[in-house]
Amino acid sequence: MTRSAKKGPFIDAHLLKKVEAAAGGKDKKPIKTWSRRSTILPDFIGLTIAVHNGRQHVPVYVTENMVGHKLGEFALTRTFKGHAADKKAKR
């Protein structure tokens, strides 16, 4: 179930403050955040946000197509090593 339209998109207040400060300045350092649940707003376009994936901060460069999605969608938490090879096929 999606979020109600009258509530608006969710974004952590501390992240919004950092984004507004970065948009005004010319500093291109990534914004470090643990807030994977925050929705990407149009103000984020062109910024690099370092999203925590449980182990490290993954840099995510925000583009126009990402608006409306959550930050956590772009910082994967699980590494897929591949399925086990079929032993019969090796012979």
Curated annotation (Swiss-Prot):
One GO-annotated biological process of the protein: ribosomal small subunit assembly
GO molecular function: rRNA binding; structural constituent of ribosome
A GO CC term assigned to this protein in UniProt: small ribosomal subunit
Any Pfam family: Ribosomal_S19
Annotated coiled-coil segments of the chain: none
Keywords, in A-Z order: Ribonucleoprotein, Ribosomal protein, RNA-binding, rRNA-binding
Record function comment: Protein S19 forms a complex with S13 that binds strongly to the 16S ribosomal RNA.
HAMAP family assigned to the protein according to its UniProt record, in alphabetical order: Ribosomal_uS19 (MF_00531)
Family, as annotated: Belongs to the universal ribosomal protein uS19 family.
Matches recorded under PANTHER family: RIBOSOMAL PROTEIN S19P FAMILY MEMBER (PTHR11880), SMALL RIBOSOMAL SUBUNIT PROTEIN US19M (PTHR11880:SF8)
Record's protein name: Small ribosomal subunit protein uS19
Natural source organism: Ralstonia nicotianae (strain ATCC BAA-1114 / GMI1000) (Ralstonia solanacearum)
Lineage: Bacteria, Pseudomonadati, Pseudomonadota, Betaproteobacteria, Burkholderiales
